[in-house]
């Protein structure tokens, strides 16, 4: 395990055992073809502001990243954008919003975002978004962090990925408990509520509680977060 992973572990105690204060959002540097994707990004930003949550994200000024970050920043919440130096010309145009941190590479970007986050949300996006989502799920499965992960499945965007996960369980490559290591919703309000419940369930699991006050999906996610893989 490398030094960046160690940093995530060190900060992980805040994510699983305390209130969710900062959300890391993975999403596309493009807006996609459907208006519903942009609408979901704007709604997520508004929900973060209403719930007094801060944002850490990939630092881009365009696409869904730009919509979420501008909404959160304009709403008076703290925004931290983390971007590799090589991507500055491609993903940043015009004025950056909030605090910007330039890092060396993609690996440092993910570790830095994870270090500052208490929970994670993936909106629709391309290869980069999917890679970030899968790595943060893998880190949870391996016990590198104990922070809840949420998938905002706008218009069924991630349905095929979810089917692939089911296939992995069916063929014996993914443990059945790990299939429920994240929470899922098709709207931001419901997903943020589930993430908060998953964080509470994870805290109860760590402290020896039974998690009875949260719903079954959150408890399943907490159980997945608690279990470590070899």
UniProtKB/Swiss-Prot annotation:
Keywords: Cytokinin biosynthesis, Hydrolase
GO aspect biological process, one term: cytokinin biosynthetic process
Superkingdom field: Eukaryota
Metal-binding recorded as keyword: no
Name recorded for this polypeptide: Probable cytokinin riboside 5'-monophosphate phosphoribohydrolase LOG4
GO CC, any one term: cytosol
Example GO molecular function: cytokinin riboside 5'-monophosphate phosphoribohydrolase activity
Reaction equations catalysed: N(6)-(dimethylallyl)adenosine 5'-phosphate + H2O = N(6)-dimethylallyladenine + D-ribose 5-phosphate; 9-ribosyl-trans-zeatin 5'-phosphate + H2O = trans-zeatin + D-ribose 5-phosphate
Entry EC no(s): 3.2.2.n1
Entry function: Cytokinin-activating enzyme working in the direct activation pathway. Phosphoribohydrolase that converts inactive cytokinin nucleotides to the biologically active free-base forms.
Residues where substrate binds: 91, 109-110, 126-132
Protein family per UniProt: Belongs to the LOG family.
Matches recorded under PANTHER family: CYTOKININ RIBOSIDE 5'-MONOPHOSPHATE PHOSPHORIBOHYDROLASE LOG4-RELATED (PTHR31223:SF51), LOG FAMILY PROTEIN YJL055W (PTHR31223)
Gene3D superfamilies associated with the record: 3.40.50.450
């Amino acid at each position: 395990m490398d030094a960046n992973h160690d940093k995530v572990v060190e900060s992980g105690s805040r994510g699983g055992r305390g209130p969710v204060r900062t959300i890391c959002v993975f999403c596309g540097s493009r807006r996609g073809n459907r208006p519903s994707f942009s609408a979901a990004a704007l709604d997520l930003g508004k929900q973060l502001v209403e719930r007094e949550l801060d944002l850490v994200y990939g630092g881009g000024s365009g696409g869904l990243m730009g919509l979420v970050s501008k909404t959160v920043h304009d709403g008076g919440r703290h925004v931290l954008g983390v971007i590799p130096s090589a991507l500055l010309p491609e993903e940043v145009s015009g004025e950056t919003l909030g605090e910007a941190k330039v890092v060396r590479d993609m690996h440092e970007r993910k570790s830095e975002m994870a270090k500052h986050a208490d929970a994670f949300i993936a909106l629709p996006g391309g290869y980069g978004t999917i890679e970030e989502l899968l790595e943060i799920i893998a880190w949870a499965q391996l016990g590198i962090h104990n922070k809840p992960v949420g998938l905002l499945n706008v218009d069924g965007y991630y349905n095929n990925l979810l089917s692939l996960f089911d296939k992995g369980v069916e063929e014996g490559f993914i443990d059945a408990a790990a299939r429920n290591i994240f929470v899922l919703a098709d709207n931001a309000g419901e997903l943020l509520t589930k993430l908060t419940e998953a964080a509470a369930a994870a805290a109860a699991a760590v402290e020896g509680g039974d998690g009875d006050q949260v719903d079954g999906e959150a408890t399943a996610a907490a159980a997945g977060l608690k279990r470590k893989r070899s």
